[in-house]
């Protein structure tokens, strides 16, 4: 598998970097149940580019999405580009792969230093100072995410509170057994749902430890 990925990346990076590319240090990162993340270096014209490949796994590419709310790679690329250009602390998206590259829906972005491992961030001594900064940094980054112009990503679906409640209820109904606690919670939410927003904003659907990178200075990038 890695040889196939490396060959496809060499061709794609060569097109976008303007020179023949050599792929080094290719490895698949752990995590990401519904998406594959590959780390690699592309060396072209004497310059080393530290990059990340995001792709659908073969079982997902061309088939059903991993979940009803999952974004396709093209939309994810568009959201990431709009966020990066809007000043969000996020990896810079570089280019999308084509069908001819043979890797399914995929794109390449720059690699950012830091760790997403909660145990290290919460306990290890090198991150002691970072732990005092991460919470306010995440608040500032969340506000920046909310300021991104969603009109720049026309393929991004608008999901009102009522839509999300209905989606959760449909998911619970597939369990084919009573879920009284969830039904009570959804009923409470449904009775108190806000009116449709006049101006929608971009939100991160899974804003938590594990979906950001941090080093000794604090948050380096928001992921996913």
PLM region spans:
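Activation loop entry of protein kinases
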Residues: 203, 221-224
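Catalytic-loop of the protein kinase fold
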Residues: 202-204, 209
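ATP-binding pocket architecture of kinase catalytic cores
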Residues: 27-161, 166-188, 192-199, 218
């Amino acid at each position: 598998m890695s040889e196939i990925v490396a060959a496809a990346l060499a061709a794609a990076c060569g097109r976008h970097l303007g020179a023949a590319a050599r792929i080094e240090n290719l490895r698949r990162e752990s995590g990401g149940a519904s998406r594959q993340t590959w780390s690699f270096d592309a060396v072209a014209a004497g310059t080393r580019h530290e990059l990340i490949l995001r792709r659908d796994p073969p079982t997902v590419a061309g088939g059903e999405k991993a979940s009803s709310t999952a974004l396709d790679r093209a939309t994810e690329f568009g959201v990431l580009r709009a966020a990066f250009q809007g000043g969000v602390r996020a990896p810079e998206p570089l280019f999308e792969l084509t069908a001819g590259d043979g890797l399914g829906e995929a794109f390449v972005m720059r690699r950012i230093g830091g760790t997403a491992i909660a145990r290290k961030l919460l306990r290890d001594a090198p991150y002691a100072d970072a732990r005092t900064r991460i919470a306010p940094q995440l608040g500032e980054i969340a506000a920046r995410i909310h300021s991104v112009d969603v009109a720049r990503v026309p393929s991004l679906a608008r999901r009102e509170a009522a839509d999300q409640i209905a989606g959760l209820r449909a998911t619970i109904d597939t369990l084919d057994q009573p879920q009284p606690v969830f039904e009570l919670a959804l009923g409470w939410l449904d009775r108190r749902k806000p009116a449709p927003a006049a101006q929608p904003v971009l939100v991160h659907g899974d804003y938590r430890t594990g979906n950001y990178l941090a080093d000794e200075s604090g948050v380096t990038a928001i992921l996913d």
